[in-house]
Amino acid sequence: TGFNFATYNDWTKSVQRKYEAKYGRIKTTYMTSDKVPAHYCIGPARVVDVTHRVGTTDPKSWPASPAIRVEDVQAHEKLYGPIKAGEVVIFHSGHTDAHFREYQRGVEDPNTAAPLNGHTEGWPAPTPETINYVIDKGVKCIATDGPSMGSVNPEEAVMTHWAAASREVPFVEFLTNAGSLPASGGFFIF
C-alpha cells in the first residue's frame, strides 16, 4: 500500500517475478529506518560463525559471495541451543576486520569495491531461506560483519533484502570485531 511496484525498472521487475514465484508476494511496509522500534535492535546476541564459508567460491564465478545457509544456523543451534524470539542474530565472517582499510585515492577498496568488481571473493551473505529461518524463530534484527547483508550478486542481494523487508526485520551491517563476542550470552545494542 502506497508503493508502486510498476516504477521498478525491467531488471528489478524480472527479479521480483523470480522472488515472488519462490517466496510469495513481496509485502510493503511503512516501517522506514526512522520508524524501526528501538527494541528490535537490542537483545541477546547469537553470533553465528560462518568463517568456514570464506574461500569457498570459484574465482571464475566472481563476483560471487559464499552463501550462508540454513545449515550454518542449525549447526550453531546444535552447539548453543535454539535461537529464541527476541535474540539478535549476528553473522561473523571476519570480512570487514580482514579487509577494511583507510580509503586511498586511486586504490581499489579491498573490502567492498574489489569483491563487487569481481577481483576478490565477496563477503559471505545469507540466502533468503536463511533470513526466513531466523525470522521464523522470532528474531527481529539480523546483523553482519560484511559490508551488506546481501551478496555481491545483485539478484541475490535484492532477494535477501526483500526477505527481511517483507517481514519488517532490519539489518545492521559493517560490524567490526564480531568475532570477539561469545557465540551465545552476549548482548547487542545498535
Task: Outline where the language-model segments fall.
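Active-/binding-site microenvironments in catalytic and ligand-binding cores
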Residues: 1-190
